[in-house]
Amino acid sequence: YILENETEALILECGISFIEVKKAIDFNLQKVAGCLITHEHKDHCKAVNEVLKTSVPVYASAGTIQAMNGQGYHEPHPLEAGKVYMIGRFKVLPFHTKHDCAEPFGYLIQHEETGNVLFATDTYYLPDRFQNLSNVLIEANYRLDILERNIAEGRIPKALRDRTLKSHMSFDTCRDALLSNDLKAVNNIVLIHLSDGNSNAAEFREGIHQATGKTVHIAEKGMILNFNKTPF
């Protein structure tokens, strides 16, 4: 994921080929203020060594940095939950999330053009509450009835159920988390990290729209959205 305008950008995660990231920003690394990483699992930090060999600063929790063991020309910058950091013109507040890894973070990111952007993935619930949100990227990984049906029909092992319940956000938890936060000024809700087999994108989008009354998107490769502070 990339938050960007004509002159600056902030990369969220680096779990895909870095060449794909560079293509998305027209190979203009000079505009990138930094790369935020939530945790050390490879689908979120696979390209970290490549990023550390560029001018792009990498930011994560101390626990994530140690677990990633990234190797490059530069060292990652450790962040602390609850402290506010200026990364370029992006104001970043890391917060703790709940996942099966060292020290996972979510991020509240504020910019004059986007307003407050909530980024929360790979967490089985959202412990914090946030005010005056403008845009939201949040995990909706599975729905319990679909997961249970897949187990009953032998499509996935039962052991995966326990791991999923303790590491990823269900549709119901996602809906409840959203409704527990201040959505009055929200322009976009983007559902991310949907399980290939344990979710239903169309039903998830409609369910969150019905619950919140907001515009809801399912994240897709190449998707471009206007994350404005105001709806116009």
Give residue ranges: language-model regions.
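Metallo-beta-lactamase
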Residues: 61-114
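Active-site environment of divalent metal-dependent phosphoester hydrolases
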Residues: 40-46, 65-67, 101-102, 126-128, ...
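Conserved beta-strand hairpin/beta-sheet module of binuclear metal-dependent hydrolase folds
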Residues: 1-27, 105-122, 134-135, 144
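Divalent metal-coordination and catalytic microenvironments
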Residues: 3, 39, 92, 99, ...
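Cap/insert and terminal regions of metallo-dependent hydrolase folds
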Residues: 131-222
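Active-site metal-binding motif and surrounding structural segment of the metallo-beta-lactamase
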Residues: 17-63
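Metal-dependent catalytic neighborhoods of phosphoester/phosphodiester hydrolases
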Residues: 46-55, 70-71, 199-207
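Active-site metal-binding loops of divalent metal-dependent hydrolases
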Residues: 14-16, 40, 97-100, 121-123, ...
